[in-house]
């Protein structure tokens, strides 16, 4: 009895091993997938796949670089809040900020506008002239912070269609090959058509992070620009008060 049970167990184990080996062999010998799509694809299919890869790399590059830039701006905002307003005057406060700080750039442009209110510019109301100088500087900062966001918007809106084009082109080529071979069995149709559908999945995989990254960065830009606008408004008030007391550049 025990020997019979042992024999049945050994036979079952052998069948499991053989089944696992067969499944492993099928996985290894799978003729479909990304590698087959690249190996069997024509110039158009390969170019489409490369475009999607480039779009993905570009969008991730923009996301990480803009994220680092926004973190720097928020750090500069904390420095300006703690150092700038404790200075003796606007010039000393600007000199105490980092060289590449947008807040230093705005302060210097505000000082430049206040000091160049002469000649024809002197006919402009001083309050309006200082306001314009600071506003131009803030617009410059905002423009720099928005650089690259158009790339994410473009990738997010076009990548699905690029992937869809690759799918349509792949299905067309698959149907042509099937028609030329004269065989329309499921094993002949499923593989090429499935490979073509991968293009749509890749297009969506490229577009979704770009759209999410765009919305996230736009929101963070809004928060950063609130700090910039608050600084500009306070600087405008300080420059007007300094001009009235004659201490703007002392």
Where in this protein do the model-derived segments appear?
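N-terminal secretory/membrane targeting signals
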Residues: 1-25
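Interfacial loop/helix-cap signal at membrane boundaries in integral membrane proteins
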Residues: 25-41
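Predominantly long cytosolic amphipathic alpha-helical stalk/bundle segments
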Residues: 27, 71-186, 212-250
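Hydrophobic alpha-helical transmembrane segments
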Residues: 36-65
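Residue-level signal for the membrane-embedded core of alpha-helical transmembrane segments
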Residues: 48-51, 55-58, 159-162, 166-169, ...
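Hydrophobic alpha-helical transmembrane segments of polytopic membrane proteins
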Residues: 196-212
């Amino acid at each position: 009895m025990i020997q019979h049970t042992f024999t049945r167990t050994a036979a079952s184990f052998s069948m499991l091993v053989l089944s696992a080996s067969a499944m492993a062999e099928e996985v290894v010998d799978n003729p479909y997938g990304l590698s087959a799509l690249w190996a069997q694809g024509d110039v158009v299919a390969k170019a489409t796949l490369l475009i999607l890869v480039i779009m993905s790399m570009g969008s991730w590059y923009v996301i990480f670089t803009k994220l680092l830039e926004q973190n720097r701006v928020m750090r500069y905002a904390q420095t300006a809040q703690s150092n700038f307003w404790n200075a003796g005057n606007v010039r000393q406060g600007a000199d105490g900020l980092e060289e590449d700080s947008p807040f230093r750039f705005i302060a210097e442009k505000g000082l430049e506008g206040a000091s160049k209110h002469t000649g024809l510019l002197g006919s402009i109301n001083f309050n309006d002239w200082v306001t314009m100088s600071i506003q131009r500087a803030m617009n410059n900062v905002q423009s720099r912070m928005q650089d690259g966001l158009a790339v994410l918007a473009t990738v997010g809106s076009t990548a699905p269609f690029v992937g869809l084009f690759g799918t349509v082109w792949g299905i067309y080529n698959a149907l042509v090959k099937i028609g030329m071979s004269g065989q329309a069995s499921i094993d002949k149709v499923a593989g090429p058509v499935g490979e073509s559908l991968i293009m749509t999945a890749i297009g969506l995989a490229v577009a979704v992070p770009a759209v999410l990254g765009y919305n996230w960065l736009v929101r963070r830009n809004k928060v950063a620009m609130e700090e910039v606008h608050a600084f500009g408004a306070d600087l405008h008030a300080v420059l007007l008060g300094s001009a009235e007391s004659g201490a703007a550049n002392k």
